[in-house]
Amino acid sequence: MISDKTLRVFLAYKKDTKDVGKFPTVNFLRDYLRSENVEIVTDYKDIESCDVILLVTLKLFSKVRSAAKEFNKKIIAIPFGDHANFKKKKNELILTNIKSLNQVDLICVETKGQMEFLKKSSVVTPINISWFSKPMNQRTSISSLEKTTFNKYFGISNDSRSIIVLGCTDSFKKAQSLARMVPGVTFVFVDISSGSLKHRWITENIPNLYYEIGMRDELYPSGIASASAIVILERWFMDMIVILDAIASNVPILAVDIPLVGTEIQAGTDFIATEESPVGIYESLQDLKHNPISDVASSDLLTKIKNDENHKFIDVIKNEIVSPKEEK
């Protein structure tokens, strides 16, 4: 372990304007590093003075690798921090640059599902499971007034039930069907892909359905905290921070099959595996009435994330800096 001197890390990340609907996982990574008194550097000319390079956007690998070789710096990759590292094809998730990941020094992920996905994708670099996403109750406090921000924005009564539906553009029809099946519940469809303004026009004829392209920063905390449930229609959902925040808020999650974060959902919250059809989701929502939310499992998981010394991301970084560098 290195000394307690202030760490300087180079954060290699490039925002993709096409990713407007995605949750900004890299923002939570920045917040985590700052909470650990880590200095974040983004100017390439400062790499020489950094302790390590954190590679979030894989297409920047060639550029940072040259600097890493010149100044003898290690590269730790965080592939699930940027949706641009993947593409979807026929309901499959495809890693866009396996070669880059096999040339870094270490890969950090947050779940077993993410690690298994990389191994199945022929990634042979050592992979470490460590948490940098801190759940809402460990990084901020939300006042009773702030909890109403989400409802006020959409004009939802505070005593009404609202359900957040997360999915890509092609899942919107399922949200339409759900809203028509349950007129007494408000559904907010958050498009986590590039989005379609046409869908917003459609909601004008469905009074209990709203459409958003991505979740606004000012609405996110109150939306998660006040939701009656979260429905995830995207099979390759990868944003662990959303899962942790739902767990911290005791919000049940309904999902079909989520390989990347499914185990963690089931370990920490009321989880209902549902059919993909709107009817199947509707029946699962009905089951929630007979399935009281338990705070025991969520408390256990969040305490583990807070206290588990073996899974602290900052310690992983420090250990990697001092370990011998292997030639790739």
Regions found by a protein language model. Give the residues of each.
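A short helix/loop element that forms part of the nucleotide-sugar donor recognition site in Leloir-type
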Residues: 141-156, 294
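Aromatic "clamp/platform" in nucleotide-sugar-dependent glycosyltransferases that forms part
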Residues: 234-236
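Short hydrophobic beta-strand element within catalytic cores of glycosyltransferases
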Residues: 252-255
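Nucleotide-activated donor-binding/catalytic signature segment of Leloir-type glycosyltransferases, i.e.
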Residues: 198-215
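C-terminal alpha-helical cap of glycosyltransferases
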Residues: 284-291, 304-328
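Conserved donor-binding/catalytic core segment of Leloir-type glycosyltransferases
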Residues: 157-173, 188
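A short, active-site helix/loop in glycosyltransferases that binds the activated sugar's phosphate group
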Residues: 103-126
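Conserved acidic donor-binding segment of nucleotide-sugar-dependent glycosyltransferases
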Residues: 270-279, 287-292
